[in-house]
Design a protein with these regions (language model features):
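RNA-interacting cores
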Residues: 2-266
Length: 266
């Protein structure tokens, strides 16, 4: 008390009220099957392209310029992602599948792309891919100003399937939400080159299934399970051509190699 004025007293803070109660997020997990609806183009960067990025491509000598520009067999092998062990030799980067789901969120009501990137996690680094690769040569346009035409050789899977393990944050997301999001990704985005997302192509699209909901797809799934590591390795070592145009181009390539007396070294 000061004079006739009564000074208010300060209440002591209760230490217990300052303790934050933080509950850990719960995580759900679901394993789903991806059954290819359209063929898959692999699009791994070649080892030569990676070396050129690492140390620079450099200018070609006159002798180097005499060599044939493309080596389709090597480009075919370089175009795939490979696993050192596992049921399959071929695989696809898990971030590519997650990216497809994030892109699909742009067209999916109730979820944002940023939320998918934060709340969904794929434990594996690569997703196993079943299916027999074929060698395919296509005409493409370079990214230079003149859009110069070039030829690109890639692994092409007419039929394919995959199995993906997806973890997600609960209760923000549910297993049903993950299935819906991956289904949308399979329909409007796809994976690999010339995928649906890019507009021009419609490749790499897929349907989403689970082990207990295969229905009429079970027969196709069982057949594709036989196209595993051994079959894929044989297909890379002794490639089959995907179409008549590729077969004609490869025949011309062999004739040109013979004319120039070029022998490929394995």
């Amino acid at each position: 008390q000061q004079g006739n004025i009564i000074m208010p007293t300060k209440a002591k803070a209760d230490a217990s009220t300052n303790v934050l109660q933080i509950q850990p997020l719960k995580q759900g997990r679901v394993k789903l099957r991806m059954m290819g609806s359209t063929p898959l183009y692999f699009n791994s960067m070649s080892s030569k392209a990676m070396r050129d990025l690492l140390i620079g491509g450099g200018k070609k000598t006159a002798a180097q310029k005499q060599h044939i520009k493309h080596n389709p067999e090597k480009e075919f092998n370089d175009s795939v992602y490979k696993k050192p062990h596992g049921e399959t030799l071929l695989c696809f980067p898990a971030p590519g599948v997650k990216g497809a789901m994030a892109t699909a969120a742009l067209e999916t009501e109730g979820i944002k792309k940023a939320s998918v990137q934060r709340l969904i996690f794929l434990p594996q680094t690569h997703v196993q891919i079943w299916g027999k690769p074929q060698l395919k040569i296509d005409i493409v346009r370079s990214s230079d100003m003149n859009r110069t035409p070039d030829m690109r050789t890639r692994a092409y899977l007419p039929r394919w399937c995959a199995e993906v393990d997806i973890a997600y944050v609960q209760p923000t997301l549910s297993a049903h939400a993950i299935v819906s999001l991956l289904t949308n990704a399979g329909a409007i985005v796809g994976i690999g080159d010339f995928r649906q997302e890019k507009g021009r192509g419609s490749f790499g699209t897929f349907q989403v299934l689970s082990e207990d909901s295969m229905g009429s797809f079970q027969k196709d799934w069982d057949e594709l399970m036989l196209e595993d590591r051994d079959v894929q390795q044989e297909a890379l070592d002794n490639p089959e051509f995907a179409d008549e145009q590729t077969a004609e181009l490869m025949q011309y390539m062999q004739e040109e190699r013979s004319r120039r007396d070029i022998t490929l070294v394995a």
